[in-house]
Amino acid sequence: MLRVALLLLPGLPLAGVGATEEPTQEPGPLGEPPGLALFRWQWHEVEAPYLVALWILVASLAKIVFHLSRKVTSLVPESCLLILLGLALGGIVLAVAKKAEYQLEPGTFFLFLLPPIVLDSGYFMPSRLFFDNLGAILTYAVVGTLWNAFTTGVALWGLQQAGLVAPRVQAGLLDFLLFGSLISAVDPVAVLAVFEEVHVNETLFIIVFGESLLNDAVTVVLYKVCNSFVEMGSANVQATDYLKGVASLFVVSLGGAAVGLVFAFLLALTTRFTKRVRIIEPLLVFLLAYAAYLTAEMASLSAILAVTMCGLGCKKYVEANISHKSRTAVKYTMKTLASSAETVIFMLLGISAVDSSKWAWDSGLVLGTLFFILFFRALGVVLQTWVLNQFRLVPLDKIDQVVMSYGGLRGAVAFALVILLDRTKVPAKDYFVATTIVVVFFTVIVQGLTIKPLVKWLRVKRSDYHKPTLNQELHEHTFDHILAAVEDVVGHHGYHYWRDRWEQFDKKYLSQLLMRRSAYRIRDQIWDVYYRLNIRDAISFVDQGGHVLSSAGLTLPSMPSRNSVAETSVTNLLRESGSGACLDLQVIDTVRSGRDREDAVMHHLLCGGLYKPRRRYKASCSRHFISEDAQERQDKEVFQQNMKRRLESFKSTKHNICFTKSKPRPRKTGHKKKDGVANPEATNGKPPRDLGFQDTAAVILTVESEEEEESESSETEKEDDEGIIFVARATSEVLQEGKVSGSLEVCPSPRIIPPSPTCAEKELPWKSGQGDLAVYVSSETTKIVPVDMQTGWNQSISSLESLASPPCTQPPTLTRLPPHPLVPEEPQVPLDLSSDPRSSFAFPPSLAKAGRSRSESSADIPQQQELQPLMGHKDHTHLSPGPANSHWCIQFNRGGRL
């Protein structure tokens, strides 16, 4: 368009349009050098990059204009609109410049425009769906392409022999076979452009799209073999040449796949060591993938197959190694390049069709080619599908076969190949070019416009893409293992057997070699779900100011909700309560209004809940990392501090943990720490009392202090933040060390004020008399308490705390309650328990002295009888730990040192 605008301006020469080079200023009459020019037009120096940028800009603006109307894009595919736009632009250029200026050059197409599209297709291809249908894809790609090429070429040659093609079309059998090889291949660019807008089901899409990618090897081999035979002449072709042609099919296809896998291995291995240079990770992905394409093209192998296998093989390991920002950059950059290249290709196809000097028309050849490619495509799909359905578990029905036959689109690959023909060797090149343009336009425009109504009319199953839930993934993996086990049992090495063997090999060798160790946590799907749930919970927690605020939490229970000072005075309160007391005027308190008090309470809540960042970040510029902005750093710090405070608050409230930063004080000489084991010498022969919650062995929780936190490194990127690490250790090990960490002290825990009764205590008053129950946990479960299991561990402790009764190391001194009501006046006589060695549960005697009436006691008897089997210790192995020196007990203290 820039050239068109420049051509309309008189006096401005344009390079490449018939204009000469930039005129040089001649010296003056006396031979003096020219003076300093204030302005010089240097178009020839920036012509190439400027035109590239201009074409991409025009293509992007065209896509924006097309999508302004949803009705237009829903009826007409985007590829059709781009071809029509190219025809319009080409006509304008031809009318102004009197000749076609731009064409789709084969070198530009194969080296610059095609690689981004194929890389995007291979990198984001669903690998599981691709390998599940690999047999059908290879059948349609290899057998189907060979069938279409030979049948189309032979049929066109027969059409010429029958006299339906003009005699001026000078072509023999080898020429028609060459034309059939380039016109029979399904184009991946056209298939992607049309089928992504139709949204057919996943199986149908992956078969057609996989065929368009993998048939490149067959197309390249057939094109090169037939072109070589044409150059040699039919009289000079030997039998060994045919054998070489068959062998080259395997060399080109397998060689291209091998090149792609080698570069995929190198790419995955390289990204394993980019932890400290994250900024170059997206660059490595594109460079090595493009190097795979160029290497295969240099060795005359299948470049499309090479870059497809490179993207398909490296994605799993690259996604695990690179950072989240790099993954986002790779995704959007790859999609942008592919979309831009596809847009430019279809526009250039439309512009190239305007130049009538490059093609010649023959109606018989054009119509015959259109009929034969449609007929033999449908016939080949029906025959191959009938064979495949004999072995497929889910057969392809007739509707799928109709869509596959109608979806064989041709595109820019066929046009680029026909342009590469040598006119001296192939005299009918101009007729082949015209026929190819008509076939491409017919398949992209006519079939692209009608395939969506056809799919709706046939009621083809559409794709319902959604991210599988954890339950679906679990069942899918379960079925895979079951089917692999069945094949292993019957001795049949089928698809599931080999897939299971590959997964074991990948887990044992490839993942260990190509992934860094920190990537294994990312691969864990359960951990990923847990992490996302935790992040969502934390975000909602931070949004509430760090506290779970509610309407009840915004006011104090003792604060009256008043509106003025007069309503909140002491006299007014006494008057409302009906008190007869007379207060002196000097002692009447001046109470602020309820709104002022609510504002004060809200101020304290916000000051205690909101967190002001303490870290000072210096502005830095790094070549290896993308530094976070101030808001990102502040949000991250607020999130970490709120989560840490929340965990500390939860631990201290639930399990009576006391965190202190002072140094441990020396213990007095006569002071003895309470143990959870009954010592006969200390009790002087008296029966030991029940073990309480305060008397069990303590678990030392190592928590990072604030001073250590403030001295952390202020690097711009610190990704692996493990948070708080709780370390459970035995009391004996801590006491043997002789000292405790400076951030924690061991001290006796004072009694705390009992909280308000819960619902269970209101319904079952005997529970409130138990005090702090000792929770015993098996030693096997408390030796290792992972950080990611803290939540389940705490819930288990809470369950034991609410259900379990206090175990006894010796026979208890309390008796089982009788079924009849208790009499408060009768004294409790200790019962000799020597005859009953079993440990049993007994309701505390405080209930008998509570002063309850007989009716209240009788009402609680059914509840006690229902709960009595639950609270009795029939199995001592689960709740009673036995001797304390061989078991691990846990105690959380509040308000004191552990």
Swiss-Prot record:
Cytoplasmic side: 1-3, 69-75, 158-175, 224-248, 300-333, 384-400, 452-898
Span list, region Disordered: 660-692, 801-888
Parts of the chain on the Extracellular side: 25-47, 97-136, 197-202, 270-278, 355-362, 422-430
Major localization listed first in the record, in broad terms: membrane
Keyword field: Antiport, Cell junction, Cell membrane, Cell projection, Endosome, Glycoprotein, Ion transport, Membrane, Phosphoprotein, Postsynaptic cell membrane, Sodium, Sodium transport, Synapse, Transmembrane, Transmembrane helix, Transport
Tissue: Highly expressed in brain. Strongly expressed in the dentate gyrus.
UniProt-annotated location(s): Cell membrane; Recycling endosome membrane; Cell projection, Dendritic spine membrane; Synaptic cell membrane
Regions of compositional bias (Basic residues) in chain numbering: 662-674
Catalytic activity: Na(+)(in) + H(+)(out) = Na(+)(out) + H(+)(in)
BP term (GO), one: sodium ion transmembrane transport
Record-level Gene Ontology MF annotations: arrestin family protein binding; potassium:proton antiporter activity; sodium:proton antiporter activity
Lineage: superkingdom: Eukaryota
Residue ranges, compositional bias (Polar residues): 856-867
Gene Ontology annotations for the cellular component aspect, listed alphabetically: dendritic spine membrane; focal adhesion; neuron spine; plasma membrane; postsynaptic membrane; recycling endosome membrane; synapse
Similarity annotation: Belongs to the monovalent cation:proton antiporter 1 (CPA1) transporter (TC 2.A.36) family.
Protein name: Sodium/hydrogen exchanger 5
Species the sequence originates in: Rattus norvegicus
